[in-house]
């Protein structure tokens, strides 16, 4: 690695964003006659998919409130569909199943999906929603549901396998992916432009840098000597709020229920769509019947043969610490601080049982 001293493009991070950028940049350079993938290197302090991309649930959907995000995700879904095998992509669809308080917002998403020709079906009303779900799952029993948005496209990808597939496509284009290289800083020229990336194995001179380190973005931000606080303008009132912390960490709660993934097959024996339920119905423990919450709650889930079970999660929560005090390393399941506890397990499995009877009694 110490022999690599220069590359026109350096991408920091071998997760979904870094690898996707490398792959598409290589294709674009070639198409424009401005270079090839050989002009790009991806460096990662560990290995491909060692951050969030390697452990995430891998859901691929178009269910976003922002119109720009919907158009971007429609484009992304089309890319996944180009090679499902290489990307380990399962095009099973996605379902947003909601209570009345979300009805208007979900209807808006449906209308905007129609505007960009993204195929989906929208079901309204308690009875029609219940019948629709029973046609898919004979044991469906979630209460208080008044809208179902069923996206025909989308689904999920097996995290590690999809990243390996994406990396292989980038490498076919000539991109070099180098593991075990830690960024320690950036060097600038007299105009303040980044001229090289400093690493633990030597400096690499470059023309362009793409920073895609996922949860380690703050560390890169600090190396670039960017501000700790920012000012944000309210688009409706015009009021500018000062000294807002640039970084606030959220902890995503996800896990896997250790059952046969085929337990979640549909009535016709097929693999099911990804299920996302948001409801304000009271949630009771499947273990002892005690009340877990009488406020709004939500979960998402799907079968996963990589982890061997039913994988999914619930709403993330804000990490109640200053950003400088949050220990990102060790990351993921190796972290003693950010692994889910029994409270999440009880809530999530009870929520599964609330939605489908087949999950009742599966709590260890």
Where are these regions (language model features)?
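Active-site lid/adjacent beta-loop-alpha segment flanking the redox-cofactor pocket in flavoenzymes
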Residues: 255-364
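Conserved Rossmann-like nucleotide-cofactor binding loop
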Residues: 17, 21, 48, 216
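Short, well-ordered alpha-helices that flank and scaffold nucleotide-derived cofactor binding pockets
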Residues: 23, 27-31, 168, 172, ...
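Flavin (FAD/FMN) cofactor-binding and adjacent substrate-gating region
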Residues: 81-82, 101-179, 184-193, 198
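Central helical "cap/lid" subdomain
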Residues: 203-291
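Core beta-strand elements of the Rossmann-like FAD/NAD(P) dinucleotide-binding domain
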Residues: 4-7, 198-208
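N-terminal Rossmann-like FAD-binding beta1-loop-alpha1 element of flavoenzymes
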Residues: 7-41
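Conserved FAD-binding subdomain of flavin-dependent enzymes
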Residues: 24-31, 39, 45-120
């Amino acid at each position: 690695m110490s022999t690599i001293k220069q590359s026109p493009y350096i991408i920091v991070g071998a997760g979904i964003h870094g690898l996707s950028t490398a792959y598409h940049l290589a294709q674009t350079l070639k198409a424009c006659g401005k270079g090839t993938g050989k002009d790009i290197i991806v460096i990662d302090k560990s290995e491909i998919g060692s951050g969030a991309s390697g452990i995430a649930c891998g859901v691929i959907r178009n269910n976003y409130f922002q119109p720009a995000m919907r158009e971007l995700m429609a484009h992304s879904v089309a890319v996944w569909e180009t090679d499902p095998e290489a990307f380990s992509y399962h095009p099973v669809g996605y379902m947003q199943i909601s209570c009345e308080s979300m009805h208007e917002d979900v209807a808006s998403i449906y209308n905007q999906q129609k505007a960009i020709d993204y195929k989906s079906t929208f079901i309204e009303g308690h009875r029609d929603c219940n019948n629709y779900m029973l046609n898919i799952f004979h044991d469906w029993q979630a209460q208080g549901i008044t809208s179902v948005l069923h996206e025909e496209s989308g689904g999920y990808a097996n995290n590690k396998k999809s990243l390996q597939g994406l990396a292989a496509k980038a490498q076919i284009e000539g991109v070099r992916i180098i593991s075990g290289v830690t960024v320690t800083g950036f060097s600038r020229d007299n105009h303040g432009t980044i001229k090289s990336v400093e690493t633990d194995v030597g400096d690499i001179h470059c023309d362009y840098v793409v920073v895609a380190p996922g949860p380690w973005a703050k560390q890169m931000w600090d190396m670039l000597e960017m501000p700790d606080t920012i000012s944000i303008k309210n688009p409706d009132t015009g009021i500018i709020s000062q000294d807002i912390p640039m970084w606030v960490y959220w902890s995503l709660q996800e896990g896997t229920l250790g059952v046969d993934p085929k337990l979640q097959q549909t009535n016709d024996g097929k693999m099911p769509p990804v299920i996302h339920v948001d409801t304000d119905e009271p949630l009771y423990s499947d273990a002892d019947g005690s009340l877990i919450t009488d406020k709004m709650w939500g979960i998402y889930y799907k079968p996963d043969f990589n982890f061997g079970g039913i994988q999914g999660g619930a709403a993330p929560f804000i990490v109640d610490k200053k950003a400088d005090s949050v220990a990102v390393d060790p990351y993921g399941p190796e972290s003693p601080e950010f692994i889910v506890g029994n409270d999440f397990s009880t809530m999530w499995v009870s929520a599964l049982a609330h939605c489908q009877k087949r999950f009742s009694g599966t709590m260890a």
